[in-house]
Design a protein with these regions (language model features):
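Solvent-exposed loop/turn segments at secondary-structure junctions
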Residues: 80-83, 134-138, 157-161, 222
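Short, well-structured alpha-helical segments in soluble
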Residues: 113-125
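Bacterial signal peptide processing site
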Residues: 20-24
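Periplasmic-binding protein-like
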Residues: 126-134, 151-155, 216-217
Length: 222
């Protein structure tokens, strides 16, 4: 039986190992991520940046010209098997594919795993953690103020008192703020449509990438 030379086998093996490492290892140093493109008219008021904890109502589609630079590292942190949470997670995955984002996922296995899941996501040191699922709001409220260097994007819910590292995207029907806290609108699972969730992750990511953090992006129109 013919066997390839040992040297050839070693070259192929080294190439395979190198390829796997370059795509999977987040410990590798690389340039800081940045926004590619610019926000359109109407995302913010002309000449003014939104104040911390304020609510921003962008013009529909004004975020569409912004995408992350190649290699942007994102963790999708999800919890809950309800349709809104699943629709949000699907939208994040589709955005990541379209934008060439390096996406990893952390899914909480139950109530007892909510806080550990947040910790696991942070230990990966991504550029951004995107949260999908109302069950994660209370754990994020506990953890995020102590980790200001980590950016969070909450989609379809919000924190009652966010720090500058927590940005949220909300709309009428999706403004859960934590157990026992009032909401700015009546919760409506039907408002979590594919189109709205797709717009929400894109608008929220554009806000974070352009430095508009610690705010709520209100997305009744998209």
């Amino acid at each position: 039986m013919h066997r390839p030379p040992l040297a050839a086998v070693l070259v192929v093996a080294a190439a395979l190992l190198t390829g796997c490492a370059s795509g999977d290892d987040w410990s590798q140093r690389r340039p800081s991520p940045s926004a590619v493109g610019a926000l359109g008219a109407g995302f913010t008021a002309p000449g003014r940046s939104p104040a911390p904890e304020s609510t921003l109502t962008p013009s529909p589609g004004s975020w569409s010209g912004v995408r992350p630079s190649p290699g942007f590292r994102v963790v999708l942190l999800s919890a809950g098997g309800d349709r809104p949470a699943k629709t949000l997670a699907k939208a994040v995955k589709e955005w990541a594919k379209d934008a060439d984002v390096d996406l990893r996922t952390v899914t909480a296995s139950g109530d007892a795993d909510l806080l550990p899941a947040v910790t696991r996501a942070m230990e990966m040191h991504p550029d951004l953690i995107v949260s999908a699922g109302n069950d994660l709001i209370d754990p994020l409220t506990t953890v995020s103020p102590s980790h200001l260097a980590q950016e969070f994007l909450v989609v379809g819910a919000e924190l009652a008192e966010p720090t500058e590292n927590v940005t949220a995207v909300d709309w009428s029907g999706a403004s859960f703020r934590g157990e026992g806290l009032g909401m700015s609108s009546t919760y409506d699972p039907a408002s979590f449509t594919d189109a709205r969730c797709a717009a929400a992750i894109r608008a929220g990511a554009a806000a974070v990438l352009t430095g508009h953090t610690g705010i709520v992006v209100w997305l009744d129109e998209f």
